[in-house]
Amino acid sequence: MKKLFLIIGAPGSGKTTDASIIAEKHPDRIVHYSTGDMLREEVASGSELGKTIESYIAKGALVPLNIIIDTIVSAIKHAPVDTILIDGYPRSEEQMTAFDELVSKEDDIDLVSVIEVRVSEEVARERILGRRAEAAPGEERSDDSEEVFNDRMKIYTDPLGAIQRFYTDKGLLTIINGERTLDEVVDEMEKFVLSKI
C-alpha cells in the first residue's frame, strides 16, 4: 500500500524544499515528487509534451489536467518506497476532484493527509522575488517574475477555500505555519509524516 501525502502552499511557501529535505533524511522510507519538478523535467527533455507544458508554465497557467494526472499516477506507481510526498497538487477544484475519484478507485493508494504550508502573500512575494535576485546566470526560473508571481498567487488562492473545505470535511487537512525557520517547518512536517506511516 502506497501512503500518499499531498503538500500544498503558495508559491514561495517552501513546500518543495521542506518535502525534499524530509525525503533525503529517510531515503529508505520516503520519496518526494514535486509536480513542478516533474513537469520541468519533461520540458527539459525537449519532447513534444515538454514543449506543450512549457507554454503553460512560462505564463504561470495551469497545465492541462490529463497531463498532470498521468504524471502523478506514474510517479506513485513507480515509487521505489511506500511513502510518497507530492507537492504542488492539487491546484484547482477540478484537479482535486479528478484525483479524489482516481484515488478512491485504487486499492493500493492511501491518501493519508493533505498538508498546507501556510504563508502570507507578503512573505511569499519576498521569497519568490528574492529567489530570482539570487539565481546564478542560466539558473533563473521563467516563473520567478513579479507579474507571473501575481498570476500564480491568484491561481493558488482562488480555489484554496474550496480545497481546504473538501479535505477538512474528509479529516485530511493539516496546516503547518510556513513562516518560521526552515528547520522548524521541516521538523514539524517530518514528525507528522513519521507519525502516520
UniProtKB/Swiss-Prot annotation:
Signal peptide: none
Reactions it catalyzes: AMP + ATP = 2 ADP
Keyword field contains Nucleotide-binding: yes
Enzyme Commission (EC) number: 2.7.4.3
Binding site for ATP: G12, S13, G14, K15, T16, T17, R131, R180
LID as annotated region, ranges: 130-144
Keywords: ATP-binding, Cytoplasm, Kinase, Nucleotide biosynthesis, Nucleotide-binding, Transferase
Residues forming coiled coils: none
Main location: cytoplasm
SUPFAM superfamilies per record: P-loop containing nucleoside triphosphate hydrolases (SSF52540)
Primary enzyme class: transferase
Gene3D superfamilies: P-loop containing nucleotide triphosphate hydrolases
An example Gene Ontology molecular-function term: ATP binding
GO BP, sorted A to Z: AMP salvage
GO cellular component: cytoplasm
Region (NMP): 34-63
InterPro entries from the UniProt entry: Adenylat/UMP-CMP_kin (IPR000850), Adenylat_kinase_CS (IPR033690), P-loop_NTPase (IPR027417)
PANTHER family: NUCLEOTIDE KINASE
Known role: Catalyzes the reversible transfer of the terminal phosphate group between ATP and AMP. Plays an important role in cellular energy homeostasis and in adenine nucleotide metabolism.
Protein name: Adenylate kinase
UniProt source species: Sulfurovum sp. (strain NBC37-1)
